[in-house]
Every structure is written in structure tokens, then in C-alpha cells.
């Protein structure tokens, strides 16, 4: 794992993080292995600085931050997002921003609305490609419908790119993030929908995807065997 305090030169700063096969490369072109913690900003906004400082103190190089688009949770403004990402940069952590409002929802229009939100606040993303990653929506698609998951993301990813958002994108698996097979079956199509070829995938390991060693290995290996970049975005029970 490479620390994030190396200052990229001007040229590589413009490209930021980049997916390369099964690996994520940082702005210096080094493989970046995430070690991080989730922070529920939307529900504990007054504790952001305290929480982020405590997370950094663990040695984490990444923090995944719960944000709100206004559909269900309080809407984060550009200023709110900037404050979060600036603090992460100060603490030498990569910020992963995700919208939590569509968690477990199966309606494609809600994913489109999440994409609309990111386009609205794109000023908080553009120019920060070397320390901000975009996790479009937390656990969109609650059922095990890989085709719907694929159709939704192949629709919104090009829209985000057309809006000028160049940050690395993370897409959570279907089935509340636990249906890794959706990535195995359709991940290549979702990746191909990104004109920047800079999309990676995440599976959330709870009682289904993380129930035992064999299941954990299968949920990761079947996708990486197809050349896709995978992370575990959440885990617990």
C-alpha cells in the first residue's frame, strides 16, 4: 500500500486515480490498496472533524463518506462536500463520496436522480481526481436483478462523464451490495459504458456475501478473473 502524501507532478494530478485492470493506481501511477473506514456524515454532521481525525489516527488511507442528495437525507451542498474532502486531504486520506438516499431501492429513476445530484454538485468533484472518488449510490437495487443493475449504471455513467466528472467511479453490487454475481455477470458491460474506462466495483460483506471464506473468495475472484477491479466497501454482520 502506498501512502497518499506523495505530491504528484502537474501532469499526473490532472489524471488522478485510474483503474488499470484489477488494480487502482494513484495519481503517481502506483498501485493503491484501500484501507479504510465508513463515516456516516449524513447523520452525525456535527462530529465530522472528530470522526475523520479518529479514522486517520488508525492509519486508514481512505474514508467512505455517507452523503445525502435530498431524496431522503439532508442534501449536501458543494460547500458541505468541499469541507469534507478538504479535511480528508489535510489528513492525507482519500475521500469516497456516496449518496445513501437510494439504498436498497429498485427504481431506476432514483438512480438517475442520484446522478442528477452529482452533476449538480460536480464542482465538488472536478479538479480533485487525485483524492476524491465517486461511489455513485450506496447499494442501489435491493433485489438480485443483475440486468436492472446493469441497465441503470450503463445509463448514468455516460451522463456523469458528459458533465465533465472525471473521478474514478465505484459501483456497488446489486442485492444491497451483497450480490457479487451481478458484477461477475454484468460488470464488463458497466465498465464498457464508461468512456474513461475508470470504473471499479464494490461488494458489501455481511451475512450473505461474507458468510464464509469460500463465499468471500468467490465474490471477489469471479470478478477479478474477468479483469475487473473490486473492493469490499463495507463489512460486518
Q: Where are these predicted regions, by residue range?
A:
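Short beta-strands and strand-loop turn motifs
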Residues: 34, 64-68, 96-100, 135-137, ...
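N-terminal carbohydrate-binding accessory modules
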Residues: 3-62
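Short active-site-proximal "capping" loops at secondary-structure junctions
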Residues: 42-44, 68-72, 176
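The substrate-binding groove and active-site-proximal loops of carbohydrate-active enzymes
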Residues: 68-72, 101-109, 137-143, 204-207
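Aromatic-lined substrate-binding rim segments of carbohydrate-active enzymes
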Residues: 48-104, 111-116, 154, 158-163
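Short, charge-rich amphipathic segments
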Residues: 12-26, 46-51, 81-88, 92-94, ...
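Extracellular glycoside hydrolase catalytic/binding regions
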Residues: 16, 45, 115-119, 123-133, ...
Amino acid at each position: 500500500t502506498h501512502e497518499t502524501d506523495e505530491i504528484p507532478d502537474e501532469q499526473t494530478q490532472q489524471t488522478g486515480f485510474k483503474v488499470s485492470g484489477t488494480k487502482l493506481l494513484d495519481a503517481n501511477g502506483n498501485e493503491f490498496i484501500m484501507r479504510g473506514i465508513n463515516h456516516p456524515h449524513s447523520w452525525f454532521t456535527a462530529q465530522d472533524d472528530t470522526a475523520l481525525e479518529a479514522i486517520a489516527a488508525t492509519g486508514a488511507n481512505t474514508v467512505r463518506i455517507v452523503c445525502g442528495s435530498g431524496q431522503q437525507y439532508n442534501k449536501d451542498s458543494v460547500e458541505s462536500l468541499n469541507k469534507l474532502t478538504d479535511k480528508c486531504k489535510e489528513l492525507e486520506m482519500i475521500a469516497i463520496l456516496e449518496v445513501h438516499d437510494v439504498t436498497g431501492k429498485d427504481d431506476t429513476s432514483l438512480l438517475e436522480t442520484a446522478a442528477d445530484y452529482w452533476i449538480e454538485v460536480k464542482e465538488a468533484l472536478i479538479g480533485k481526481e487525485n483524492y476524491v472518488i465517486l461511489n455513485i449510490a450506496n447499494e442501489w437495487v435491493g433485489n438480485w436483478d443483475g440486468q436492472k443493475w446493469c441497465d441503470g449504471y450503463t445509463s448514468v455513467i455516460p451522463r456523469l462523464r458528459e458533465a465533465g466528472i472525471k473521478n474514478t467511479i465505484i459501483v456497488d453490487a446489486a442485492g444491497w451490495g451483497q450480490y457479487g454475481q451481478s458484477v461477475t455477470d454484468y460488470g464488463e458491460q458497466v465498465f464498457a459504458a464508461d468512456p474513461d474506462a475508470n470504473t471499479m466495483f464494490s461488494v458489501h460483506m455481511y451475512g450473505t456475501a461474507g458468510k464464509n471464506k469460500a463465499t468471500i473468495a468467490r465474490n471477489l475472484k469471479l470478478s477479478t478473473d474477468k479483469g475487473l477491479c473490486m473492493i469490499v466497501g463495507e463489512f460486518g454482520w
